[in-house]
Amino acid sequence: MTAPDDVCAVVLAAGLGTRLKPLTGLRPKALVPVGNTPLLDRALHRLAAAGLAGAGRVAVNAHHFAEMITEQVGTRAHMSIEDKEPLGSAGAVGNLHGWIDGRAVLVINADAYVDAQPGDLRELLDDWDGRTIRMSGHRADDGHPPFGGLAFAGASLLPAADAAVLKPEYSHLVLTTWRPAERAQRLEAIPLDGTYIDCGTPADYLAANMHATRGQNLIAEDAVVTGAAHSSVIGPGSAMFGVVRRCVLWPGARVDADEVLTDAVRVGRDLTVKVTGA
């Protein structure tokens, strides 16, 4: 499956992840693992399934722990480093003006968990006239969906003309692009056929991992497990000798034989982020 040549993609991975601390004090939000796969890798896989891959078609922006993101991306995408401060969703696109080179832009967030059919992003491209702004949307729980009866689900397709006017300064697409397009009746919300979880808080992050487990355990091949695990994610190189229920063990984490963890994220030997109300 290939995407039209006049479309490129920008993956937003420069967020600070403030609400996800202390986890984001160790790695950027885009690299926290869900189901033992970093969120950024999940985003790049989604784009590849829609026909967008490689440094000529995909760019990733970075700020917080930029060197980690650059290493993770490797040659899979063009890197746009925002050194001084993150530029926001619109500023990130404006900062890539030369690389975009007059193409339409599919902008996706790297910090959300999406479980959908392979190639789901193609739905934003199918039968597109190149003039409307499209966004992926999901049913909102709060009863006040902001866009065409849907809440934003992490992906937006910008016509070339709309992308070209964005500037490399701090700004967000919701104000610069989406709302003006909505007022002009140029905004289309395309329902996401799948699950979308914004991993903004520890509770949401745990929920995304629990969705990925589907009620089972996800255990990395090289993990050592002699204890009892229930609906948990156990990362590469980790050691689990105790009891864990609905937990996430990051790579290299350890749970000793005398420990019982429930609804928690364990990093290393000592850092435990407990989730209340999970």
Located regions from the model:
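Conserved N-terminal catalytic core of the sugar/cofactor nucleotidyltransferase
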Residues: M1-V11, R19, P33, T37-P118, ...
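Short alpha-helical oligomerization interface
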Residues: G25-A30
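A generic local structural motif
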Residues: R42-R46, E71, G91-N95, G119-E123, ...
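Short loop/turn motifs at secondary-structure junctions
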Residues: G51-G54, D101, D129, V243, ...
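Active-site regions of enzymes building and remodeling cell-envelope glycoconjugates
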Residues: T75-S80, G143-A151, C247
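Catalytic-core segments of class I nucleotidyltransferases/pyrophosphorylases
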Residues: V105-L106, Y113-G130, R134, R139-G215
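Extended beta-solenoid/beta-helix repeat architectures
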Residues: A207, H211-A278
